[in-house]
């Protein structure tokens, strides 16, 4: 059914289009009555939310097969319903809308996505996947805090936690698969659970209105933990010229770096404003990880591996440069918008072309040989 053959096709296309469009509010502030609020809301709930849904729904059949189920994912009609919910959220959740209308619209997509994941996971008794299936509910928490309290720190910590939960499973899994290891997914190491717990505790402390120094201290602990968990990863393939894996690892590094910068800012160890420091976790982590994962859906297939094309690597490099520029120059926000928007426009073109070609199976990894 064209665009509806696989859930990642429409959701990735919408997400990349939104990533290119939303920052333009800094060049044309009249697009909305509150550019700051709309910008931070839509890059998290619109852009990252669509990308998250595209990945999780595409991974769902694999989860169900591992649990002994039939491995059937969401139907085309289900995908259409989620896309409609996403669009309603963008229309109803505008900065100028009343809070009740906005929150009702913004809640539709996270709730629909969570139900689309949780129900089949519960039916298949794939209990190990339940935390990730429930992860979209964090988007609902972010929407509530952004809308009712103008709380951008919850959004930043919430997105970091989502990447730690989801990315912290898929990045080492892709690395291990490239080594030819077929032993299956190993349990998450205790250190990784501890690192995720520290990040979740930082978010909880903030929600409980704890002093910034306590939130910052826990963010620093989480940064250390997210760095140390990499010692269990099979990093050799990423370090030996496998471009697709290198993108994932480089994207991941923004998580401990961003948490460290955030922690230093909250504890007063650095003088940069938080509005600048948080871009390491939004532009850096969120933008890089979304691209590194979604690009796998259109990368060229070689025996046992994916090949990252020059265009994908170039766009990834542009995202790194725009993030570093934003961090180095606090007032450089509007200046980096054209580069960011152009980069995501190119990614949207890749998504559009991919929707016209056969969907590769598996979507995000190479078929194993032999």
Name the predicted role of every residue range.
Residues 1-370:
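Hydrophobic alpha-helical transmembrane segments of multi-pass integral membrane proteins
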């Amino acid at each position: 059914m064209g665009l509806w053959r696989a859930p990642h096709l429409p959701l990735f296309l919408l997400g990349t289009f939104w990533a290119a469009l939303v920052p333009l509010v800094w060049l044309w502030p009249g697009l909305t009555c509150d550019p700051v609020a709309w910008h931070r809301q839509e890059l998290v709930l619109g852009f990252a939310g669509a990308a998250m849904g595209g990945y999780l729904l595409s991974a769902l059949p694999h989860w169900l097969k591992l649990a002994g189920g039939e491995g059937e994912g969401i139907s085309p009609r289900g995908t259409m319903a989620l896309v409609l919910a996403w669009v309603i959220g963008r229309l109803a959740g505008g900065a100028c809308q009343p809070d009740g209308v906005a929150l009702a619209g913004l809640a539709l997509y996270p709730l629909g996505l969570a139900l689309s994941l949780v129900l089949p996971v519960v039916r298949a008794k794939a209990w190990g996947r339940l935390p990730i299936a429930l992860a979209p509910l964090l988007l609902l928490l972010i929407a509530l805090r952004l809308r009712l309290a103008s709380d951008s720190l919850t959004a930043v910590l919430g997105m970091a936690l989502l990447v730690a939960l989801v990315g912290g499973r898929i990045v080492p899994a892709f690395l291990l698969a490239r080594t030819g290891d077929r032993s299956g997914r190993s349990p998450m190491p205790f250190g990784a659970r501890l690192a995720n717990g520290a990040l979740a505790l930082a978010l909880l402390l903030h929600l409980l209105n704890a002093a910034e120094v306590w939130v910052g201290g826990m963010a620093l602990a989480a940064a250390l933990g997210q760095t140390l968990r990499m010692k269990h990863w099979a990093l050799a393939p990423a370090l030996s010229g496998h471009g697709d894996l290198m993108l994932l690892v480089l994207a991941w590094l923004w998580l401990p770096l961003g948490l460290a910068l955030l922690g230093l800012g909250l504890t007063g160890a650095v003088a940069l404003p938080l509005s600048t420091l948080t871009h390491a976790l939004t532009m850096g982590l969120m933008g890089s990880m979304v691209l590194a994962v979604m690009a796998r859906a259109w990368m060229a297939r070689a025996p046992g591996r994916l090949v990252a094309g020059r265009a994908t690597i170039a766009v990834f490099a542009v995202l790194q440069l725009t993030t570093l520029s934003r961090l180095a120059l606090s007032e450089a926000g509007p200046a980096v918008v054209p580069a960011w928007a152009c980069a995501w426009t190119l990614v949207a073109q890749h998504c559009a072309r991919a929707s016209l070609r056969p969907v590769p199976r598996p979507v995000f990894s190479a078929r194993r040989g032999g």
